[in-house]
A protein has these predicted regions:
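Pre-Walker A (Motif I) flank of P-loop NTPase domains
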Residues: 1-4, 127
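Glycine-rich phosphate-binding P-loop
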Residues: 5-19
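C-terminal helical "lid" subdomain and adjoining coupling/linker elements of P-loop NTPases
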Residues: 227-231
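Conserved phosphate-donor/acceptor-positioning beta-strand/loop module used by diverse small-molecule
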Residues: 142-179
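ATP-dependent small-molecule kinase phosphotransfer cores
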Residues: 39-128
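Small-molecule kinase domains that catalyze NTP-dependent phosphoryl transfer to phosphate-bearing small molecules
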Residues: 59-66, 79-80, 169-214
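Short beta-strand-centered segment that lines the nucleotide-binding/catalytic pocket of NTP-utilizing
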Residues: 28-39
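Short, amphipathic alpha-helical "lid/cap" segments that border enzyme active or binding sites
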Residues: 117, 213-217, 221
Length: 231
């Protein structure tokens, strides 16, 4: 039951390598957008969900089911975060949103961390998952057998990649890379007092100016297989 966390600077390939590695390993892949989409799906009635055998659910449906269970447990425990709408808002928070210090934040730091930690730990405990970002390398750092991967690339290359991928001007891509790097670093310093690019937090560091995303995915999958044996 492999568990991989992917962390990386924007446009360094963490998302692409994570998805490709999940495909090679036959595991699920989850990132912020998939979590938000799953929370949005919680409006689907239980009757509709009950008509399906859980083994036939798509990963998105299973993720929604997991989040529904999380909300039910939170409500039973008197947790202040209740309802799919509140969860969707929380999961949609960016690094920049949570790194800011506000006197009266819409979502408190403690609620955010408690919720994200619980969700990511449950994903890790279930296994067969590649998780992108959200501090997953910190939350699952003590999970036996989990593989933590960092992707890096020179800023100039990341700007070039982002401009091409998003169809934006180089100046706009430059600002976005700068803002993303700053927010990602501030987020990890705020919640874990950690340098997000500290290589000691990771088992593998991939410098993607020197290798393709496909090779990076093969290296990640190979490392997982060497730890858990053939599937």
């Amino acid at each position: 039951m492999p568990v991989v966390t992917m962390s990386g600077t924007i446009a360094s390939g963490a998302r692409e390598i994570g998805r490709a590695a999940a495909s090679l390993l036959g595991t699920d892949y989850v990132d912020q957008q998939l979590l938000v989409d799953a929370a949005r799906r919680l409006g689907v009635s239980l009757d509709v969900m009950a008509k399906h055998d859980e083994r036939c659910f798509s990963f998105g449906e299973r993720l929604s089911s997991m989040l529904r269970g999380f909300l039910e447990r939170s409500a039973a425990g008197g947790d202040p975060l209740t309802g799919a709408g509140g969860l969707e808002v929380l999961l949609g928070r960016t690094y920049a949103d949570m790194a800011l210090e506000r006197e009266e934040p819409e979502i408190s730091d403690s609620v955010y961390m408690k919720t994200m930690t619980a969700i990511i730990r449950e994903l890790g405990d279930r296994g067969d998952i590649v998780v992108l970002g959200r501090g997953s390398q910190m939350i699952l750092r003590d999970l036996p057998g989990a593989l933590h991967v960092l992707t890096l690339a020179p800023q100039e290359l990341r700007i070039e990649r982002l401009a091409a991928r998003e169809g934006m001007l180089v100046e706009e891509a430059t600002q976005r890379v700068h803002n993303s790097d700053k927010a990602r670093g501030a987020f990890h310093r705020k919640f874990w007092k950690a340098d997000v690019n500290d290589s000691s937090l990771y088992d593998i560091t991939l410098e993607t100016s020197r290798l393709s995303y496909e090779v990076g995915a093969e290296l990640v999958a190979g490392a997982v297989r060497s730890n858990v044996g053939p599937g």
